[in-house]
Amino acid sequence: MPSQDSDFPQKEHEKMTEFQEAVTFKDVAVVFTEEELGLLDSAQRKLYQDVMVENFRNLVSVGHVPFKADMVSQLETEEKLWTMERETQRNGHSSEIHSAVTSGSKIPNEMETLGKVMFKYLSCEELSCWQIWKHTTNDLTLQRKSSWFLHGDSLQVSEDENHIMNHKGDHFGCLENQEFLIPTAQASCGSRCLSESENPSRGKQMSVKNHLHVCEGFTKNSPLSDPGKTDAKQTPCKGERPHPCRVCGEGFSHGAVLPVHQVDPGEKCSHLQTHQRIHPGGTVNKCPKSGDGFHQNSFHPHHSNPTGEKSYRCDSCGKAFGSSTGLIIHYRTHTGEKPYRCEACGKCFSQSSNFQCHQRVHTEEKPYKCEECGKGFGWSVNLRVHQRVHRGEKPYKCEECGKGFTQAAHYHIHQRVHTGEKPYKCDVCGKGFSHNSPLICHRRVHTGEKPYRCEACGKGFTRNTDLHIHFRVHTGEKPYTCKECGKGFSQASNLQVHQNVHTGEKRFKCETCGKGFSQSSKLQTHQRVHTGEKPYRCDVCGKDFSYSSNLKLHQVIHTGEKPYTCEACGKGFSWRSNLHAHQRVHSGEKPYKCEACDKSFSQAIDFRVHQRVHTGEKPYKCGVCGKGFSQSSGLQSHQRVHTGEKPYKCDVCGKGFRYSSQFIYHQRGHTGEKPYKCEECGKGFGRSLNLRHHQRVHTGEKPHKCEECGKAFSLPSNLRVHLSVHTREKLFKCEDCGKGFSQSSRLQAHQRVHTGEKPYKCNICGKDFSHRSRLTYHQKVHTGKNL
């Protein structure tokens, strides 16, 4: 057969799943005699039972059934393996059933029919199993229910599935196509092994010479070692070694052996290693504690994996395993194979143990109970992790910040806080997350899904934790208490925010204006002042708002709802805050006090506006003339000067006003209302400002002084009139005649000359006058006072 060594490195991984070495039950079995079992206590018996059950399940999971169908259930009910062996020995099948236990073969009528056949052979050189397959059976496919036999130097496959024969000069016959390999007769020596991936197909022949694993103890007795039985084309002259190793220089008589020479010894065929244990006196394993040598089939409790050797290595990732079963299960991570499917939800698993644990999700079985709190768990590992909560154990420490964790998974997720890694991305908006569960919750923002419903009010939530927190609204539970003042909170985050009141800490700073905030959310909201962002829009009128709370307050305008009513006067309010502020009118409470002037205010907003009097702050600027104002309402009123807008109209005379305050004062002129009374003389006034000015007549106060001549005035308007004496400025011009006046009031009086208006009438004789001073002079005629 032509050599294909050149193809070997490139295609090494292409058929690894096909070349997986066969797993014998002997590789993983733990066998005790009846006397040895009698030395075990109950805990050791339970451990032995668990190990054997898992071994059987693992073999079943990869398609190997080297036992009766009910053996797993027998093991689970603590029936003993040695009992089954002893009963079989009485029936005359001692050697065969021992092989079934240790090697994984079977006996007719005792074991179920298996799927494939493997044999052990003898050869003079060693090759790993999958290399034999590579060199001999590239195009061969194993057919089920075929029989094999050794014929000379060739391995032939018979079509007769019941055919079993022994050849002259050979110590081996053939069995029905099986998955596990045993000799069919007791030979003195010369066992040859061929793994699962080496089986040729029906009707084909393959040369087995130089392609089989050899037991060094039997090489001399091999019929293949006779040069007369070898092919001249393949066998070099005696002593000749034409194939040297490039690394160490050692020569080999066959080129096919060279690649195996370069393979790590731990990767040699497992069947050869297993076979070597049957030689008398052979002690493959040695206990480092006691020094005892033992075969795997004479395992003692303290001899479990004594050397810690992991001879089964994955060619894909290099990971090593102590048994071939573990390697087979591991290899499914590369192939993606998941043979165990849940009938309830369709989820698939690569291991039977994980599948069995998953089924408890549907059955809600929780067999593992915590002795401390009684909490149940579906998996024992979850119970062990939970018990760390009671012990306060946190074995996983972060080297960056020293924070401890009870679970390794939580520790790994936490490390992403320091690394900034966010491997989980949202497909819709691209937002990243450090672990999977927040991504699942985030996706519900896009889908609108709210799977968690409150049974009390029907409100939906995207996260289960939000539902638990919300439910405290109904129960009134406040588990988080401030140690400083004893105030309770339903959420831990609210407690953390509250504690900033005591510490005064404001960790979150605005990079634009430097203002500090105790919460990051408040900083984010504040930044909209600088960006002008208004993400919340009213569906009714289209108005935008920077805050969701402002939108909710605004929407009450459209509904007209006033759910908050004052118990003292019955007045209704749309917002609770307005009700609280109104109630201070009745109580007289003014909790906001100015430290500069000791003035008090009932509302916080009035207090903040007042403070600008002392600071001189005028944050609201007119875009037309640049004039500044301390309040936004002042800016809005001022802008009407430029637009000429007068939205407030008098129903009596039709006069318009820019400001609501001016309109209110004007209406009192028609009604005669004068609510502000002087306590000294009883005179009434329509405006509080006029009362304050009048009181200066009694006090003699003249706060407005002329800087030119030092003359003082009680009113600022009088000072402005006086200043025109020094400047001789006449700003107010008559459009009819061009005459100038220093005061607007004098211009208005002058314009009556042109209009003929006489608004002042005598109540006694009905005579009209254009000026108030002239009416006053006329009234003295009727009173008889000296003119």
Curated annotation (Swiss-Prot):
The lineage of its organism: Eukaryota, Metazoa, Chordata, Craniata, Vertebrata. Keywords: DNA-binding, Metal-binding, Nucleus, Repeat, Transcription, Transcription regulation, Zinc, Zinc-finger. Its main location: nucleus. A zinc finger (C2H2-type) spans 243-275, 312-334, 340-362, 368-390, 396-418, 424-446, 452-474, 480-502, 508-530, 536-558, 564-586, 592-614, 620-642, 648-670, 676-698, 704-726, 732-754, 760-782. It is found in: Nucleus. This is Zinc finger protein 227. Pfam families: KRAB, zf-C2H2. May be involved in transcriptional regulation. Belongs to the krueppel C2H2-type zinc-finger protein family. GO terms for cellular component: nucleus. Residues 23-94 form the KRAB domain.
